[in-house]
Amino acid sequence: MFPSGLIERPANWVALAGFMGTGKSRIGWELSRALALHFVDTDKLITRVVGKSIPEVFAQEGEGYFRACEREVVQRVTRLDHAVISLGGGTFIHEENRRLLLSRGPVVVLWATPETVYQRTKHSDRPLLKVEDPLSRIRTLMNEREGVYRQGTIHVHSDGRPSEEIVEEVVERLWAWRDAQAAWAALPPDYDRATS
């Protein structure tokens, strides 16, 4: 990894949010390589700290315990520098997490259709999909969460696209975000922002 001062990048900290199966871990890893940043997967961090897989945590301790662990991990990762953070699918849903994440830096939300999510997750051991009709459950959860996911900074669709193309779009959108932030910060203090 390059020392952090040798590369110009659009952001030194980025989080990836979105529904399960949208590609957050894969894209996060590749984005971290493209930006020469560390990569942290919050679900993997939780399993390392707790010493159990996420399905085991859900089964043995319950979803409430898992969400408490998730909140603690969010507090930790928002203190990091030079990192790309892949969030669990439900992490951004909780207001305290969302507030911390959005105040720390850009949150890129990855999107995919329910059918794509189902195809990507149908052979996994995801606790929220242990139901009779997982596709219906995916549709319901995605509909419930859509408004919250829309609060992210940048939105990118991952359906049917190679990961390199998605990463390239994320980087381009991060540069545009950084430029917009710089332009906004350059406005004079007495500028009436309501008239823009």
Swiss-Prot record:
It comes from the Bacteria. Its EC number is 2.7.1.71. Mg(2+) binds at residue 25. Pfam families: SKI. Its main location: cytoplasm. It is found in: Cytoplasm. Keywords: Amino-acid biosynthesis, Aromatic amino acid biosynthesis, ATP-binding, Cytoplasm, Kinase, Magnesium, Metal-binding, Nucleotide-binding, Transferase. It is an enzyme of class 2 (transferase). Substrate binds at residues 43, 67, 89, 145. Binds 1 Mg(2+) ion per subunit. One of its GO terms (biological process) is chorismate biosynthetic process. CDD domains: SK (cd00464). ATP binds at residues 21-26, 126, 161. Disulfide bonds: none annotated. One of its GO terms (molecular function) is shikimate kinase activity. It catalyses: shikimate + ATP = 3-phosphoshikimate + ADP + H(+). Pathway: Metabolic intermediate biosynthesis; chorismate biosynthesis; chorismate from D-erythrose 4-phosphate and phosphoenolpyruvate: step 5/7. GO terms for cellular component: cytosol. Its cofactor is Mg(2+). Belongs to the shikimate kinase family. Catalyzes the specific phosphorylation of the 3-hydroxyl group of shikimic acid using ATP as a cosubstrate. Monomer. NCBIfam families: PRK13948.1. This is Shikimate kinase. It comes from Deinococcus radiodurans (strain ATCC 13939 / DSM 20539 / JCM 16871 / CCUG 27074 / LMG 4051 / NBRC 15346 / NCIMB 9279 / VKM B-1422 / R1). The gene is aroK.
